[in-house]
């Protein structure tokens, strides 16, 4: 799958925001970056929620950490029946989406997308954790491509010899 983070700065590459692999989610610790490059390793979806609460990931980072946490939750319950997996994932979705009050609305939306993807994957007999991870990459691609488009429009609005004094994610414009 083509990725919109190709050739972007370290801080924007998906693996350096939050990444599910081998039964854990690694989240770049933005509380100390760029002074140090360290990752917080979460081995349960509750630990992902705690990392979000504790501001390990910041700015748009929770919007990658939350669905990667859902992939981890799917991995945690992989041996259960389909109904039990969905029940487990619904509880995980609540825990993750309510980890930070300022991001709850959007994280609920993302967790709901993950629940739909889990239902689809279970019906198709696919690996639910991998399906949610791939959906997260797809969602990131959509967001990154949208922000690139917004950024290109914004650049055209700068006056000749203008100065940009601060930088934020384009979605805040």
Give the label of every model feature segment.
Residues 1-49:
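Positively charged, low-complexity intrinsically disordered leader regions
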Residues 50-99, 104-173:
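N-terminal active-site beta-alpha-beta segment that forms phosphate/nucleotide-binding
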């Amino acid at each position: 799958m083509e990725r919109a983070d190709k050739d972007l700065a370290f801080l924007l590459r998906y693996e350096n925001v939050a990444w599910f692999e081998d039964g854990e989610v690694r989240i770049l610790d933005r509380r100390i970056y760029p002074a140090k490059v360290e990752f917080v390793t979460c081995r349960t979806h509750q630990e992902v929620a705690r990392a979000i609460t504790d501001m390990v990931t910041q700015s748009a980072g929770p919007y990658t950490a939350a669905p990667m946490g859902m992939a981890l939750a799917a991995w945690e319950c992989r041996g259960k029946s389909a109904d039990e997996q969905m029940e487990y994932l619904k509880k995980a979705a609540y825990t993750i989406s309510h980890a930070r009050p300022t991001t709850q609305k959007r994280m609920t939306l993302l967790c709901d997308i993950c629940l739909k993807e889990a239902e689809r994957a279970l019906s198709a007999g696919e690996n639910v954790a991998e399906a949610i991870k791939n959906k997260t990459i797809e969602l990131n691609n959509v967001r990154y491509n949208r922000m690139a488009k917004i950024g290109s429009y914004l650049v055209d609005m700068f006056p000749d010899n203008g100065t940009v004094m601060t930088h934020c994610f384009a979605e805040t414009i």
